[in-house]
A protein has these predicted regions:
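Generic hydrophobic alpha-helical membrane-span motif
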Residues: 24, 45, 80, 177-178
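N-terminal small/polar loop signature for handling phosphorylated ligands or for N-terminal nucleophile
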Residues: 1-34, 135-146
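A glycine/threonine-rich phosphate-anchoring loop and its flanking beta-alpha core
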Residues: 30-128
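C-terminal charged capping/lid subdomain of soluble metabolic enzymes
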Residues: 93, 209-297
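Active-site segments that bind and position negatively charged phosphate/pyrophosphate groups
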Residues: 119-239
């Protein structure tokens, strides 16, 4: 439908946030035209990325698109957006702690290519959000500016690295697993960043608990060292909660057995090494699952 309506036009402007932006990017990519976005919420990091998620046959897939030509925003509009949408944006950005750790883990353990320029851009944008976290929680101008800038930088970092590594790790795999669950049941799907925020809490705890795991395994020392640079899950939960985001999967209406299934199987979502893959390789989830369920369900 979008492609049909865009025929004959050389430019499409999406007015909105995630879904409309994705549709415009994909449609104009296929037609060889250009697009822009007038953002109405700082809710996700796909504004400037070169890929777009699509729902195909009841599954979530990521396909090539192109980045927008222009990004327009009125910060009075962004600040007035529903708090949960700003919370979703915060969930997507604070997830970058885990994304970068997962990427570095894969680089050091598996030799995956690492792009320092993309990682440095993401770290700097993340630091600005941490510095303005109080204003973000209050949906204040400075905080929303920092958050929106970080969301744009995240897209640029993906373009620079040539993939979504700077912006997507195990927490996104958890989100995508749950998205498929909601899709197949025909139920309303919670905002992407809301689910990613929950996945971030799980990933942070998975990293932090490694130092107390008695079992020795390849990569443990590296993972524990990476965990030292990560914030405490309680801090991230406080930020998300202040914006109205859930901090337990039960708040999404997901059954406990589905969350348990997610913990054991979401690594299959994508062939990408993360802390979740580390747990699978070393059979760590069997001893961690009950603990994670008690904390986050």
């Amino acid at each position: 439908l979008a492609e049909e309506r865009a025929k004959g036009y050389g430019y499409v402007l999406a007015v909105g946030s995630g879904t409309l932006n994705d549709i415009a990017k994909y449609t104009t990519f296929r037609q060889g035209t250009e697009c822009g976005v007038y953002a109405t919420a700082a809710s996700m990091d796909g504004f400037t990325s070169g890929v777009t998620p699509l729902i195909c046959g009841g599954n979530k897939v990521t396909v090539n698109a192109h980045t927008v030509r222009h990004v327009l925003a009125d910060f009075s509009v962004l600040c007035a957006a529903p708090r949960i949408m700003t919370g979703a944006g915060a969930g997507d950005i604070f997830a970058k702690y885990c994304c970068l750790a997962d990427w570095r883990l894969s680089h050091l353990l598996k030799g995956e290519a690492w792009n320092e320029e993309a990682a440095s851009l993401m770290r700097a944008a993340l630091a600005q959000c941490v510095e303005n976290v109080g204003s973000i929680a209050a949906c204040g101008r400075e905080g929303v500016e920092a958050l929106f800038a970080a969301l744009l930088v995240s897209g640029y970092a993906m373009v620079i690295s040539g993939n979504s590594r700077p912006a997507s790790g195990a927490e996104h795999h958890m989100s995508h697993f749950l998205e498929v669950y909601f899709l197949r049941r025909g139920e309303h799907i919670p905002l992407h960043g809301v689910k990613v925020g929950l996945g971030t809490l799980v990933s942070l705890h998975m990293y932090k608990r490694l130092k107390d795991v008695p079992q020795d395994f390849a990569g443990k020392e590296i993972a524990v060292k990476l965990a030292e640079a990560l914030p405490e899950p309680a801090w991230a939960a406080g930020v998300l909660s202040s914006l109205g985001c859930p901090t337990r999967f039960s708040q999404l209406g997901v059954p406990e057995d589905v969350v348990r299934d997610m913990l054991f199987n979401c690594w299959k979502i994508r062939d990408r090494y993360t802390v979740m893959t580390l747990y699978r390789e070393n059979d760590l989830m069997r001893s961690a699952a009950d603990e994670l369920i008690s904390l986050f369900y």
